[in-house]
Amino acid sequence: MKSLRLPATVLFCLLLLIKGLGAAPPGHPEAQPPPPSSEHKEPVAGDAVLGSKDVSALEVRAARNSEPQDEGELFQGVDPRALAAVLLQALDRPASPPAPGGSQQRPEEETAESLLTETVRSQTHSLPVPETQAPAAPPRPQTQENGAEAPDPSEELEALASLLQELRDFSPSSAKRQQETAAAETETRTHTLTRVNLESPGPERVWRASWGEFQARVPERAPLPPPAPPQFQARVPESGPLPEAHQFGGGSSPKTHLGEALAPLSKAYQGLAAPFPKARRPETSLLGGTEAGERLLQQGLAQVEAGRRQAEATRQAAAQEERLADLASDLLLQYLLQGGARQRGLGGRGLQEEEGGGRETARQQEEAEQERRGGEERVGEEDEEAAEAEAEAEEAERARQNALLFAEEEEGEAGAEDKRSREETPGHRRKEAEGAEEGGAEDEDDDEEMDPQTIDSLIELSTKLHLPADDVVSIIEEVEEKRKRKKNAPPEPVPPPRAAPAPTHARSPKTPPPAPAPDREELPDGNEELPPRDRXENEVFSPVPYHPFPNYIRARTVQPPPASRRRHYHHALPPSRHYPDREAQARRAQEEAEAEERRLQEQEELENYIEHVLLRRP
């Protein structure tokens, strides 16, 4: 009986080892069972039977003791994803359903299955099982006893689930995915959108709202369904719930309990295997799919831009019109002021010329007297008097121009008021027409030029110049009168050029040029001639050099007298006839004349502009 139970015990131990190592990934040779010794292959009767029993018991204890050690060293250096995939593949393998009568299972099938499984897992050696005769009844009681000693499968499942959870929690990619998920949720929750409402023109034209409010306000768009991860669609049937629980509802097997316990792990594995989709911005996913939102935004932006351009063009046109009106009014006033000043300046210039002629005659008389007196003092006095006279003349001319300018302004204001009062009186134009018929040709020309059409154009011009119509009419009439006066006036004589004034600074007295120096041949030699007071009749000096070497001391009697030394005459340059002061004054006078001519030319151009542009504008 013992000889018959021995192979069943060995087979049960082998099955326990296979179940313990079924979840181990390939490539760990340390997890494989050690090769059986020769004691298992060749059983011997008698004492050999007892020895084989002890050996089998020792193997079972060693397998039990090695299970926690192998469990600790089993998953070291293995990728969490690969480990989870291997575990799920091991779980998804369909197991053979247990027969209703467990006692009818044939030991030959178990032996063949164990041989096949062991050969595939080890990949290095096979475990030959000794051929045994099929017993009439399977060793059920022994299996139950050994099964009671085997570890509880529920504890193994709990340990495996906790291990997978730890692997998933401590994987480096899970923390990153959690951060990305939190950032995406925060971005979606706090995102706001700006929309332009084209119907309301008030401050509610542009409103800001959260994404949910915008989605509610846009009725033509339907929310898109959340995209399913396509990476894991092929693996769903493999990792789905195991069919054992549905097929065998009444029976309970370790495989069924294992599938039920690892169902949440398979769902977690789906989340691990599928890459996390990138957080897409809601406006690109919703507004990019439809054209209504884009069209609304484009229309709103186009209207805002068009309104801005129109306002800018209106502002520029108003500024340009105001600038032109200011320029025209400034030109008119400048023309009026410069025209009166010019005419009065011409009259004052005639008086100034007369006064200048009197001053010139007086100056000529004074010069004649100074020439009679002679001397250099008269030149300085003449310069000082000329400078004083010029300064007085300039001051008088300035005062006269200022007085004439103020008088002209007062007369212009009084004339404008008189013309306004006459225009307000009825029948004013009829009286002017009668006076024009009785008057000469000048009045007729005046009426012909100032016709009603011209007055209408002038009134239109006044609106552009921001001035009253009466003021513009009076200004234009004054301009016309001055123009006629200038045409009828005789040509003004060209004034003679001014003489260059005498220099104002005092010149130094003229010194007569020195006499030319005598020739060297005519000069007497110092050794030959002596002054008459020191020269003796028989005294002759030896031709010895005066200073043969430095620090040489000679007697004083031997030294020649100082009168006999050579005299060197320094030739003084003759006084130059070039007087820079007179040339500078002449140049200054010429520049003043050119400036006056340019000023007159500018006034003429201004008058022509007013006559041909402003007065003839429709």
From Swiss-Prot:
Q: Where is this region: Disordered?
A: 23-46, 86-201, 219-262, 342-603
How is the polypeptide modified once translated? Multiple peptides are derived from VGF, with activities in synaptic plasticity, antidepression, penile erection, autonomic activation, and increases in energy expenditure.
A Gene Ontology molecular-function term?
growth factor activity
**Is DNA-binding included in the keywords of this UniProt record?**
no
Q: Give residues where Phosphothreonine occurs.
A: 425
List, as start-end ranges, the regions of compositional bias called Basic and acidic residues: 356-378, 416-434, 578-602
Listed Pro residues bias regions? 26-37, 490-500
Record's GO cellular component, any one? extracellular space
Residues bearing the modification Phosphoserine = 421
Keyword list (alphabetical) reads:
Amidation, Cleavage on pair of basic residues, Coiled coil, Cytoplasmic vesicle, Growth factor, Phosphoprotein, Pyrrolidone carboxylic acid, Secreted, Signal
What's the name of the protein?
A: Neurosecretory protein VGF
Native source species: Bos taurus (Bovine)
